[in-house]
Amino acid sequence: MAQEIYDIAIIGGGPVGMFAAFYAGLRDTKVILLESLATLGGQVTSLYPEKTILDVAGFSATKGTDFIAALSQQLQRFPVDIRTQTTVVNLEKSGNLFTVTTNNGTFIQAKTVIVATGKGAFEPRKIQVAGVDNLVGQGVHYFIKNKHDFDNHHIAIAGGGDSAVDMATMLSHIAAETTLIHRRDNFRAMEQSVKTLMASKVIRETPKKILSVSKQPDGRLKLRLAHVKDNQQVNDIIVDDLIINYGFISENKTIQAWAVQPKLAGQVFAVNQTLETNVPGLFVIGDASHYIGKADLIAIGLGEAPSAVNAAIRCFDPNRGGPGHSSSMVLKDTIVRND
């Protein structure tokens, strides 16, 4: 039996990869979606399930888990071949076909490939305070799976970016007391998020750093804070939980081992106006791609997905019409024309 050949193989099952797979189904292509984790959703599912997403069109505010659930439901409309716990360990190209080798020992052939892996594997940026790592899971957290684990708790959040600011505001509605610790007086977050923070009941400890974290006899944590310019100017706070949100360190070691190596722009892939790399038929979307003016937002990646899919189709079927509009396609036996 001849090996099955896909029109498009999409590597990465985060929001951008999921939407690309849906749109590929909308264009009636044979598509496979490969995700290394056990579930779809990427960083939104793994790192920010409780975070409120504000910058996606059509959603005034949506929780990360709800957003991924909506994408999953949308994806079920078409027979996309979805394989989770599948890491692409090699990508080769021979003639007009790509061969994808997975950690499961399977070989997948595709006419085109769309990479939507984000910045790659990720791990939290650790706080550089002695002894804190021993307290992870005992009041110190790098991830939040369920915000209600902090109901009526006294909590401290270390960080000053979008995630830390949004988390502090969100948890202030359910925690007994919320303190945000940042090394600067100014926060590196969206302007409206900062305005919301300033109007909230969150206590701001700035410009401060954490000197030490110690476990108290009652199980709570004592945080010794110091002014960033004067270690003698200190104060202590007692909390139930410390959430460290210094961002994440990412790497693409797996991709670096591929036989196919498209041109890089720093640590991500350089693409042209159709999201294609210098390797014909290989496209990159989302945070893994770079072009002049690129912003790393979910909304941007979602917009790139249809462009990459349409360009991929033109690679293996130049005579095919497109790009396609959903309002002129067959959906559940109903045709609507936008004449």
From Swiss-Prot:
* Organism taxonomic ancestry: Bacteria, Bacillati, Bacillota, Bacilli, Lactobacillales
Q: Please name the HAMAP family in this protein's record.
A: FENR2
What the record says about family reads: Belongs to the ferredoxin--NADP reductase type 2 family.
Assembly and partners?
Answer: Homodimer.
Q: Which cofactor does it need?
A: FAD
- Report the protein name in the record: Ferredoxin--NADP reductase
Question: Top-level EC class, please?
Answer: oxidoreductase
Q: Which GO terms describe its molecular function?
A: ferredoxin-NADP+ reductase activity; flavin adenine dinucleotide binding; NADP binding
Q: Which UniProt keywords apply?
A: FAD, Flavoprotein, NADP, Oxidoreductase
Catalysed transformations (reactions): 2 reduced [2Fe-2S]-[ferredoxin] + NADP(+) + H(+) = 2 oxidized [2Fe-2S]-[ferredoxin] + NADPH
Mind telling me which PANTHER family this protein's record contains?
THIOREDOXIN REDUCTASE 1-RELATED-RELATED
Annotated cofactor note: Binds 1 FAD per subunit.
Xref: SUPFAM superfamilies: FAD/NAD(P)-binding domain
Query: What does the record give as EC number?
Result: 1.18.1.2
